[in-house]
Amino acid sequence: AASDCCSACICDRRAPPYFECTCGDTFDHCPAACNKCVCTRSIPPQCRCTDRTQGRCPLTPCA
């Protein structure tokens, strides 16, 4: 749904050494959600949330 937002981030390791950071565990309502996810340059890469939203979910789904 367009109102979905992200509560977790996942690092996709299918194409090393490049890593795609995507949202996981999306819910229709989440009090503290991720609007964006980024991968760190650590080894192994870690996926973390950026641009946190409070209260309402983002109007567009996290990609």
UniProtKB/Swiss-Prot annotation:
The record marks 13-14, 41-42 as: Reactive bond for trypsin. Pfam families: Bowman-Birk_leg. It comes from the Eukaryota. GO terms for molecular function: serine-type endopeptidase inhibitor activity. PROSITE patterns: BOWMAN_BIRK. Transmembrane segments: none annotated. InterPro entries: Bowman-Birk_prot_inh (IPR035995), Prot_inh_BBI (IPR000877). CDD domains: BBI. One of the interaction site with trypsin probably also interacts with chymotrypsin. Belongs to the Bowman-Birk serine protease inhibitor family. This is Bowman-Birk type proteinase inhibitor B-II. It comes from Arachis hypogaea (Peanut).
